[in-house]
From Swiss-Prot:
Enzyme superclass (EC): ligase
Known EC number: 6.3.2.8
GO cellular component: cytoplasm
Gene this protein is translated from: murC
Any GO MF annotation of the entry: UDP-N-acetylmuramate-L-alanine ligase activity
Name of protein: UDP-N-acetylmuramate--L-alanine ligase
Major site of localization recorded for this protein: cytoplasm
Residues the record lists as binding ATP: 113-119
Amino acid sequence: MFRGRVRHVHFVGIGGVGMSGLAEILRSLEFEVSGSDLKESSTTRRLTSLGVRIDIGHRAENVRGVDVVVYSSAIRPENPELTEARALGTPVIGRAEMLAELMRVKYGVAIAGSHGKTTTTSLVATVLRAAGLDPTVVVGGKMAALGTNARLGAGDLLVAEADESDGSFLRLTPTIAVVTNIDPEHLDHYGTHERIKDAFVEFAARVPFYGLAVLCLDHPHVQDLLPRIPRRHVTYGVSPQSDYSARGIQFRGLETSFNAYRRGEPLGGFTVKMPGAHNVLNCLATIAVADELEVPLDVTKQALATFGGVARRFTVVGSIGGVTMIDDYGHHPAEIRATIDAARRAFPGEDHRVVVAFQPHRHTRTRDLFDEFTRAFNQADVLLVTDIYAAGEPPIPGVTAERLVQSIREHGHHDARFIADKTDLPEALEKIARPGDVVIALGAGDVNACVRGLKARLEAKSPPQEGSS
């Protein structure tokens, strides 16, 4: 790799989920690792426990004496640490370039797509670990089985989530490339949907002549790309035209089962402890990757059946007084619809209402997908919307959460409410929730605190359980 010339790696924005994973991998490889972030978090505390020096706040002196500086897509070019590093002549690289360097010396499996990539990456990693292949894993969420989002493995494989948000995933050179779906997203970078599709074509084309692209046929924008993919590829989906397909899908509470087929050949029944039709697709992508890597079918089945999930992906926070509370990272209209649909399937019947607390993520996304957001919550009985989580972006005139709620009402939703202060959400939810309700916190910011706050409120007023002290 680059050992010898580089001994000390510094991460600007180390608390981010993608950055922290790379930092943990490099620390496991015995590099000296340091980093900075604007605030302390459970992630920074974990890294500190691993021997990573972390400074709170971005200051020029933080990068003096380091060999390379890695920055995330959230860091602005004028950041004082980047400015100082460039002045010192220290190499400054993006996160994707560092991930690409790790992948260069491995057999890379990269999972990209507008949605589902974190879960699919985690599923693939789980199956390959169960097969004894001991992959290195870098994923955009905390895997329950690992207790973290990254792990250095002894095997030749590297399984990574590929972030398409700024186009930097085109630096990766995977041997297997998965594309889960393509939606209008990150238009602040790409400008048009067609340019997004072009980027995914280039991503799939980066696999070598002996590699494989795994593509979701059910998604029309992915299907559009098939004639343009110059490499060997297979498709997956519920469609019978898919190379890897599913039939007989059944939803039983938080569990989903289906029968899988490979070009019409039955592969048997599969079960996963996650609700939602979208997770069937994530499993099919995993089955296709495992098949390419010659993982025995029974190993794949068992690994999927015991998969423990990923943090903030339909995570059940608790169930008190008949109220089930769920934390989900969904922040794009397609993800929102899929999560609400999964809740409807997991908790069917008239006795169950779906109550959603939503925090829009980024002003640009709210602006670019405003019309789609107005129709994304039709299946929610009650909707609470709080202010936009800026993620470092400046406000955009006329783009507000309050205006979004107004538009949602204008488009036919009968119970959409604006809660300006997110700290008021737990109290508002407590007043709304009744036995049988499913309360979902939706968003990529910090809205998940509201369901934990609701849980604390319900616990405080619920009668003590027998045998408790």
